[in-house]
UniProtKB/Swiss-Prot annotation:
It catalyses: choline + ATP = phosphocholine + ADP + H(+); ethanolamine + ATP = phosphoethanolamine + ADP + H(+). This is Choline/ethanolamine kinase. Belongs to the choline/ethanolamine kinase family. The modification N-acetylalanine is found at A2.
Length: 394
């Protein structure tokens, strides 16, 4: 990435002096003094957590009193609210019920109710295949999941060669799964078109969102992006679509040598391979654990270099091509083709999450600088677009 190595907090200030040609011309918003992410839990949320655990888990959970249940917020979610629910030590287990679970409450539902049903089915299938946490309960507002002793990876750990290779292998195995969902790759542009229409239909009070749409000519730009990707070969596989550090758990008590687990499948679908890899590379830049407004940091210089991308690609292809014998020339061509594929689909990642964040700004109750983040993603889009020498002649 063509940027200096200093940390950039947030994106440019919406409505300020902007340039869509790169990040360096953008003005970052002034941090809001002493504004930190809240970790408090409302009494109503505590009560509802108790009711769901009691009803869906049964056993010892029915014997514990509401005030005895430990409900602690889990940081890291930008789409949902997460809580760790635990039984008190003095309440004995009665059977095979878990003693602690993860409660996921849906945030602003942008995908539609049908997508939530499909996600729950997907979650259950992956759990049965030991590829994800167990599912303990599903209800309209969210679900109860297995709490895994683990921690999410940190943004800077994505650059670690050993971890990067392991993530590539994990992604390749995910891509090789057969799932009972439509194989037509409509998810990417279908979702972006819906997001854009929802943004355009926002009330007139949502002026900052309208400014972003007009500033970047997003409708026309989406058509340009579609033309580029239509001319970019990329296999359709079952994609996670959100492999960022917060969705990769480092297990404390793994059942095998494989100590990484992918979680959060709400955006998973059959999609183009290039999007999943390009999206992961974009996430090398963003740290969502920043504790002050806008609650993320962007470091453009951390976008993976050519060599870092090749390391990932080689581990990915090694898993996909198990048993195949390729000449050195064939292998090199595959690597070069994949570099081009990824660089183009990385644009789609910026565009997708830029639209997503613009819409979240008008709906979400999660403390996060959604508009600042949207602007950062769109600026990255235009910067990386300008670096694609073959953009106009794919």
């Amino acid at each position: 990435m063509a940027a200096d190595g200093t940390g950039v907090v947030g994106g440019g200030a919406v409505g300020g002096p902007l340039s869509k040609d790169g990040l360096l011309d953008a003005k970052c918003p002034e941090p809001i003094p002493n504004r930190r992410r809240s970790s408090s839990l409302s009494r109503d949320a505590q009560r509802r957590a108790y009711q769901w655990c009691r009803e869906y888990l049964g056993g010892a959970w029915r014997r514990a009193r509401p005030e005895e249940l430990s409900v602690c917020p889990v940081s890291g979610g930008l789409s949902n609210l997460l809580f760790r629910c635990s039984l008190p030590n003095h309440v004995p287990s009665m059977g095979g019920e878990p003693r602690e679970v993860l409660l996921r409450l849906y945030g602003a539902i942008l995908q539609g109710v049908d997508s939530l049903v499909l996600e729950s089915v997907m979650f259950a299938i992956l759990a049965e295949r030991s590829l994800g946490p167990q599912l303990y309960g599903v209800f309209p507002e969210g679900r109860l999941e297995q709490y895994l002793p683990s921690r999410p990876l940190k943004t800077q750990e994505l650059r670690d060669p050993v971890l990067s290779g392991a993530i590539a292998t994990k992604m390749a195995r995910f891509h090789g799964m057969e799932m009972p969902f439509t194989k037509e790759p409509r998810w990417l542009f279908g979702t972006m078109e819906r997001y854009l229409k929802q943004i355009q239909d926002l009330p007139s009070t949502s002026l900052p969102q309208m400014n972003l749409v007009e500033m970047y000519s997003l409708k026309d730009e989406m058509n340009h992006l579609r033309t580029l990707l239509d001319a970019t070969p990329s296999p359709v596989v079952f994609c996670h679509n959100d492999i960022q550090e917060g969705n990769i758990l480092l297990l404390s008590e793994p059942d095998s040598d494989d100590n990484l687990m992918l979680v959060d499948f709400e955006y998973s679908s059959y999609n183009y391979r290039g999007f999943d890899i390009g999206n992961h590379f974009c996430e090398w830049v963003y740290d969502y654990t920043y504790e002050e407004w806008p609650f993320y940091k962007a470091r453009p210089a951390d976008y993976p270099t050519r060599e870092q991308q090749l390391l990932f690609i080689r581990h990915y292809l090694a898993e996909v091509q198990k048993g195949e014998v390729l000449s050195e020339e064939e292998q090199k061509k595959q690597e070069e083709d994949l570099l081009i594929e990824i660089s183009r689909y990385a644009l789609a990642s910026h565009f997708f999450w830029g639209l997503w964040s613009t819409l979240q700004a008008s709906m979400s109750t999660i403390e996060f600088g959604y508009l600042e983040y949207a602007q950062s993603r769109f600026q990255f889009y235009f910067q990386q677009k300008g670096q694609l020498t073959s953009f106009l002649s794919p």
